[in-house]
């Protein structure tokens, strides 16, 4: 048996619409329209051949007390084609980020619910 790829990553959110404003409005991801009724709010977003699933469910995993730098927290890493454009979008939206401490062209930010994201050029 061989695992071929990652199909999706799930992210717990408190407010789907607020999260869509970040993931679609700021980051430019596209929302899929084929999400079935799963009995709770949420959204599926397309990221290349993979997806991010936003789950509006009770979050039993508090985000308080997590490291300020997302690289020291659990996070999802995404490849970007234009690092400077991403930084401009985050700046315009007032979203704080930190640069990678590894020397790579990468940055870390958090979504509206405190979930850490890494973007690598």
Where are the regions a protein language model picked out?
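Mid-chain, well-packed structural core segment of small domains
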Residues: 68-87
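N-terminal beta-strand motif that seeds the catalytic metal site of vicinal oxygen chelate
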Residues: 1-18, 74-78
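Short acidic/glycine-enriched loop/turn segments that link adjacent beta-strands
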Residues: 37-41, 72, 102-105
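Short glycine-enriched loop/turn motifs at secondary-structure junctions
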Residues: 3-5, 68-73, 100-101
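Vicinal oxygen chelate
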Residues: 2, 87-121
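Core segments of cupin and vicinal oxygen chelate
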Residues: 10-51
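A short, acidic/glycine-rich surface segment
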Residues: 39-40, 59-65
